[in-house]
């Protein structure tokens, strides 16, 4: 996909839920394995939707992953023979993830991260905007709006079938029962007084 060289770099895969971020990360990791490169995949411990030890896409593709509690724990699992470091659900990592990713790329690793670029309110999510700014390559994926069928760049959180309010908690790990992809026009975030 990108010109391969001996220097490290950062790739960010971002977009709304159900846009194929984990699927794309898995595809890139599998391609490196076909090329006889050594890859390791990480995920935050908080992400246990489908598996505690795998990154799993919504369509069922999976790859083995190391769950970590803190960004700097990633260093404990890196060895010299590694070529590619992949990190899924990067928005759930602590603020140190930007430094960790920078250090890994500066050491010569290809670093692939995937995550939500916006929270359910449509605002920048976690450290993803900073990672996008320092990345050599950014891939922004879109889903299909579950309301109208247009390209969807936002994630709609639903609570009992209704849009979540703006001041509801930001982090709530779920799947289709609590989130839907939406386009700009179908995305709704009421304030608590509107509910």
UniProtKB/Swiss-Prot annotation:
Reaction(s) catalysed (UniProt annotation): thymidine + ATP = dTMP + ADP + H(+)
Active site: 89 (proton acceptor)
Keywords: ATP-binding, Cytoplasm, DNA synthesis, Kinase, Metal-binding, Nucleotide-binding, Transferase, Zinc
Coiled coil: none
EC number(s) stated in the UniProt entry for this protein: 2.7.1.21
Binding locations of Zn(2+): 145, 148, 183, 186
GO molecular function, one term: zinc ion binding
One of the Pfam families matching this protein, by short name: TK
Residues the entry annotates as binding ATP: 15-22, 88-91
GO CC term (a single one): cytosol
A GO biological-process term: thymidine metabolic process
Matches recorded under InterPro entries: P-loop_NTPase, Thymidine_kinase, Thymidine_kinase_CS
SUPFAM superfamilies with a match to the protein in the record: Glucocorticoid receptor-like (DNA-binding domain) (SSF57716), P-loop containing nucleoside triphosphate hydrolases (SSF52540)
Compartments, as annotated in UniProt: Cytoplasm
Quaternary organization: Homotetramer.
Family: Belongs to the thymidine kinase family.
HAMAP family for this protein: Thymidine_kinase
Protein name per its UniProtKB record: Thymidine kinase
Gene symbol of the encoding locus: tdk
């Amino acid at each position: 996909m990108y010109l391969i060289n001996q220097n490290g770099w950062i790739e960010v895969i971002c977009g709304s839920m159900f846009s194929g971020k984990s699927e794309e990360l898995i595809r890139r990791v599998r391609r490196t394995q076909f090329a006889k490169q050594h890859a390791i995949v990480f995920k935050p411990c908080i992400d246990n939707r489908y598996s505690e030890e795998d990154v799993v896409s919504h369509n069922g593709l999976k790859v083995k992953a190391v769950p970590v509690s803190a960004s700097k724990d990633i260093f404990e699992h890196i060895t010299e023979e590694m070529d590619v470091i992949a990190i899924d659900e990067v928005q759930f990592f602590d603020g140190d993830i930007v430094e960790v990713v920078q250090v890994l790329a500066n050491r010569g690793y290809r670093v692939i991260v995937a995550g939500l670029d916006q929270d359910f309110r449509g605002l920048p999510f976690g450290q993803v905007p900073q990672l996008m700014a320092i990345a050599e390559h950014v891939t922004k994926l879109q889903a299909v709006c579950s309301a109208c069928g247009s390209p969807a760049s936002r994630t709609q959180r639903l609570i009992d079938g209704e849009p979540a309010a703006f001041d509801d908690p930001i982090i709530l790990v779920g799947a289709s029962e609590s989130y839907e992809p939406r386009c700009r026009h179908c995305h709704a975030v009421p304030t608590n007084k509107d509910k």
